[in-house]
Amino acid sequence: MNINGRNGLACITRVRDLKEPVVIRPPPSFAIIRDFVVDMTQFYKQYHSITPYLVNAEPPPEKERLQLPAERDRLNGSYECILCACCSSQCPSSWWNPDKFVGPAGLIQAYRFIVDSRDRATEGRLDDLSGSYRLFRCRTIMNCAEVCPKGLEPAHAIERIRLKMSGAREQGGPLDTHPPLSPR
């Protein structure tokens, strides 16, 4: 929802803290279906394009794929995304290129799988994000971080993916040398 000109979740917005009159609108950049219902087809299409699940062809272990605490910590600041689309609907790059730019929500999810030690598709994920529109249309305006109800910073995850694509990828160095993302 767009509440008094700011994207947010109606379910956690405290009305008594808002300036009156309270103006509620559908989120910008999405086509309106009816009233406050918007068409999120393109948003989910971009989300599904990043392969939002672990890819691992190794035979599964008896119980589960374990991670060291440090490996698990690398997921902090990315797995908490609830796909509310507040960030993507506030992002100018998503407005201008909705069919090409993955968007902040999709990219923070891509980062989550790129740094997951249990995933075996990092190179393929990076290849899928290459090109001038999929990842590199982010201009770090930071609207995404400003409106995220979970306090996440998609632009930082996007920057780390860029680093992985450029330097660390050629050197074979891990993206994991950076401290984990953390919610604000």
Regions found by a protein language model. Give the residues of each.
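Ferredoxin-type iron-sulfur electron-transfer modules in oxidoreductases and energy-metabolism complexes
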Residues: 22-89, 93-184
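Hydrophobic/aromatic-rich structural module bridging two neighboring secondary-structure elements via a short loop
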Residues: 1-28
